[in-house]
Amino acid sequence: MANRGGRHARNEESDNTINYVQCDGLAVMKMVKHCHEESSNMDLAQGALLGLVVDKCLEITNCFPFPKSGDETMDEEMYQLTVMRRLRRVNVDHLHVGWYQSSDVGNSLSLALLESQYHYQTSIEESVVVVYDTQKSSRGFLCLKAYRLTPQAIQMYKDGDFTPEAFRTLKVGYESLFAEIPIVIKNSPLTNIMMSELNELLPEDKGHNFLDLGTASVLENHMRSLIERVDELYQEAVRYNKYQQVVFKQDTEKHRALAKLAAENAVRTSKGEPTVPEEEVIKQFRPMPVPARLTATITSGQINTHAQHIAQFCSQSLAKLFITESLQNAKEAKETK
């Protein structure tokens, strides 16, 4: 991931820098190939997106993978500059417009993703992150989504304040950290002609796989990930509850000490002696540091994503079950005649 710095002006309204992303078919194939190659090694695939901005459309025309983090001799920033310089020499779009990464079972939202996109978006205003879900795509559903940080999330990360008060002030929740940008895939006319010719050469699909109900592993993976995220959120809730208990105990002791001081000052006043200022008592109780809620917010977003995927998967499975039952009943009725 790139580590970029920059300035970003606060914008309370929605981000209208990019309305949609148009991705070239060749760039999509490169991303898909790279992500599937790395998924076999259980590694996270990441790479740079190249293209240009036309009006409100971000056109992605090329991409290249980042070097693996295990190679300590590789300077990642120098590697990216070298690749873009060589692409420029051969008259290929070389402008950096974002980055992409692979995802497994919908586990795309993370602290690392938020941090990297913040550095990108504050230095390259129109940059996006494209997330490719390898497991869902391997089942026949191309899952390619583009995201940008919302202005509120950028301001929160810029301030470095992740307390509950900051989340309430900026009205930031897990659903408003990222904004999904519509993405379309465009091919050249020659590519479309070639795809039409190849489609005629493919054998006709009888459609048996569409009613396949043996997909328990998919639901199992989603449920396992969901249980892990719920456990993490529970641990975060326990930590925050302990913080609230400590703060409540400290406030109780401080009020008791102030009440005692007020009584002592009343006695001193009646005797004509100088009173002790309240600051002497208050400074004995240092305010407790408020725990950051960013991790809990991200975990909540992951739980919401898994719940949506499970609901979608179950609805599709139920639809397959009813269709299969109807076809089976029709087949049995036909055989009895």
Curated annotation (Swiss-Prot):
Domain MPN, first and last residues per copy: 21-153
Bilayer-crossing regions: none
Gene3D superfamilies in alphabetical order: Cytidine Deaminase, domain 2 (3.40.140.10)
Family annotation (Pfam families): eIF3h_C, JAB
SS bonds (residue pairs): none
Compartments where found: Cytoplasm
Entry's family note: Belongs to the eIF-3 subunit H family.
Protein role: Component of the eukaryotic translation initiation factor 3 (eIF-3) complex, which is involved in protein synthesis of a specialized repertoire of mRNAs and, together with other initiation factors, stimulates binding of mRNA and methionyl-tRNAi to the 40S ribosome. The eIF-3 complex specifically targets and initiates translation of a subset of mRNAs involved in cell proliferation.
Subunit relationships: Component of the eukaryotic translation initiation factor 3 (eIF-3) complex. The eIF-3 complex interacts with pix. Interacts with mxt.
Alphabetical list of HAMAP family matching this protein: eIF3h (MF_03007)
Name the UniProt record assigns to this protein: Eukaryotic translation initiation factor 3 subunit H
Organism: Drosophila ananassae
Upper lineage: Eukaryota, Metazoa, Ecdysozoa, Arthropoda, Hexapoda
